[in-house]
């Protein structure tokens, strides 16, 4: 072996040790940590930080679907956490999915985007605050003679706010009840709940779907673009399943 080849081979070995070995150590640490995290969940303790750590472990192990699933769960607790959102975006970038979101009017998209920074509980709280303020102002307008014009204007403002908040709140409730993530590799949505049924379209690991109904180990799902099909229940996991209710 020539000196130059020896130097090249040594450099490759050195780079491999520097780049891959820490990754392997991290994966080994994740293998040890995951059972402990899962045990905490089974004990009934849930938090955004716990789901975030679980997601990071799955991401390190290359299980992108389960990573996205747990980042979504973390965002139910800590929707404004920048680390969760950055890692969630990175996990999405590692999937094969294409954008299947149905097009919505710009105003609706903007409104939903704004309320993505609030948890479901926070959105419900804001909705009821606006609702009760609107009701209180309407009652005050009937009994208070002074400033009726101002009270009427404020009541209209809070009524409009209540209606506007109702739209993203409805979407959040829908997602909390039906949202699921594909956790297997590529799977096919089928026309009927049977493995030999006609394949309709592929679903990739990490894709978001909505579960419409279940039937003996199969789930009828709907993509965000409203295409529907049947897949095996083992290929997906509900974001807010029985053990992850918020």
What are these regions (language model features)?
Residues 147, 153-184, 191-194, 198, ...:
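Boundary regions of SH3-family modules and the immediately adjacent low-complexity/disordered segments
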Residues 198-215:
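Conserved beta-strand/loop element in small beta-rich adapter and peptidoglycan-binding domains
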Residues 102-141:
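Membrane-embedded alpha-helical segments of integral membrane proteins
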């Amino acid at each position: 072996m020539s000196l130059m080849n020896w130097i090249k081979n040594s450099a490759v070995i050195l780079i491999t040790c520097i780049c891959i070995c820490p990754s392997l150590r991290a994966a080994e640490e994740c293998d040890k940590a995951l059972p402990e995290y899962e045990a905490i969940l089974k004990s009934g303790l849930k938090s955004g930080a716990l789901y975030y750590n679980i997601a990071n472990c799955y991401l390190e192990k290359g299980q992108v679907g389960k990573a996205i699933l747990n980042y979504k769960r973390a965002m139910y607790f800590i929707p404004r956490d920048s680390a969760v959102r950055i890692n969630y975006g990175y996990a999405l970038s590692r999937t094969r999915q294409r954008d299947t979101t149905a097009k919505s009017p710009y105003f609706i998209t903007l409104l939903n985007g704004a309320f993505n920074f609030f948890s479901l509980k926070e959105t419900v709280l804001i909705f009821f605050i606006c609702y009760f303020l609107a009701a209180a102002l309407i009652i005050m307008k009937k009994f208070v003679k002074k400033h009726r014009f101002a009270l009427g204007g404020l009541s209209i403002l809070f009524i409009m706010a209540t209606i506007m908040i109702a739209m993203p709140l409805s979407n959040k409730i829908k997602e909390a009840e039906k949202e699921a993530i594909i956790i297997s590799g590529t799977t096919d949505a089928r026309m009927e709940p049977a493995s030999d049924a006609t394949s309709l379209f592929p679903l990739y690991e990490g894709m978001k779907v909505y579960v419409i109904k279940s039937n003996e180990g199969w789930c009828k799902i709907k993509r965000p673009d409203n295409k529907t099909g049947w897949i095996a229940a083992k290929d997906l996991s509900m974001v807010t399943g029985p053990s992850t209710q918020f």
